[in-house]
Amino acid sequence: MIGRLSGILVEKQAPEVVLDVNGVGYELQVPMTSFYELPALNQAAMLFTHFVVREDAQLLYGFITKQERALFRLLIKTNGVGPKLALTILSGMTASEFVSCVERDDIATLVKLPGVGKKTAERLVIEMRDKLKSLLEASAGSEREFMLQSNYTPAAAVDSAEEDAISALLSLGYKPAQASKSVSAAFKEGMSSETLIKAALKSML
């Protein structure tokens, strides 16, 4: 099993990235919470990984921290939650925000995420409450565990920021009208794709 990958970030199109490791390009699906932390293209990055084998595909999921990966693994063990929905949940809120929802029985916030109905939200709260205790203990005082080159600079804003943001939201399961409306409302001149996606997601919670 591949536990982590370190290499050069050669492609970024939320929620997918490609990491070049010694000449081999690994395609990974990453939650937006991890995507926001990634460097610009052609910079060094490291991601903790989870490997999923299906009948029709073999997929790699990448995470900035072990804690995010641990939460992803807990989510996919919940009845009715697969990797795609787990990725959507982690893209819509941070790990700490999710933990807070579970602790407060905040069904109303969880159902705002695409693909999460009332029954799924209730099941998440019930099944995840005890499982999260170990995650919280592991997360206490933890630091970000990814390495970037010392000359790292944030990715520059691009003209297609709105298109990239809408595409990312569609990939996460949001409806076209909802994605377009939230991106348009959140957009400000000079915004990068990452910043715009983050603002659009926040506006829907």
From Swiss-Prot:
Stretches the record annotates as Domain II: 65-143
Keyword DNA damage listed: yes
Name of this protein: Holliday junction branch migration complex subunit RuvA
Gene Ontology CC entries for this record: cytoplasm; Holliday junction helicase complex; Holliday junction resolvase complex
Family: Belongs to the RuvA family.
Keyword terms: Cytoplasm, DNA damage, DNA recombination, DNA repair, DNA-binding
Segments of this protein annotated with the region Domain III: 157-205
Swiss-Prot/TrEMBL GO biological process terms: DNA recombination; DNA repair
Chain residue ranges for the region called Domain I: 1-64
Protein function: The RuvA-RuvB-RuvC complex processes Holliday junction (HJ) DNA during genetic recombination and DNA repair, while the RuvA-RuvB complex plays an important role in the rescue of blocked DNA replication forks via replication fork reversal (RFR). RuvA specifically binds to HJ cruciform DNA, conferring on it an open structure. The RuvB hexamer acts as an ATP-dependent pump, pulling dsDNA into and through the RuvAB complex. HJ branch migration allows RuvC to scan DNA until it finds its consensus sequence, where it cleaves and resolves the cruciform DNA.
Entry-linked HAMAP family: DNA_HJ_migration_RuvA
Entries under InterPro entries matching the protein: DNA_helicase_Holl-junc_RuvA_I, Hlx-hairpin-Hlx_DNA-bd_motif, NA-bd_OB-fold, RuvA, RuvA_2-like, RuvA_C, RuvA_C_sf
Gene: ruvA
Subcellular localization, as worded in the UniProt entry: Cytoplasm
DNA repair recorded as keyword: yes
Domain writeup: Has three domains with a flexible linker between the domains II and III and assumes an 'L' shape. Domain III is highly mobile and contacts RuvB.
Pfam families: HHH_5 (PF14520), RuvA_C (PF07499), RuvA_N (PF01330)
Superkingdom: Bacteria
Location of the region described as Flexible linker in the Swiss-Prot/TrEMBL record: 144-156
Primary localization: cytoplasm
GO molecular function: ATP binding; four-way junction DNA binding; four-way junction helicase activity
Subunit structure: Homotetramer. Forms an RuvA(8)-RuvB(12)-Holliday junction (HJ) complex. HJ DNA is sandwiched between 2 RuvA tetramers; dsDNA enters through RuvA and exits via RuvB. An RuvB hexamer assembles on each DNA strand where it exits the tetramer. Each RuvB hexamer is contacted by two RuvA subunits (via domain III) on 2 adjacent RuvB subunits; this complex drives branch migration. In the full resolvosome a probable DNA-RuvA(4)-RuvB(12)-RuvC(2) complex forms which resolves the HJ.
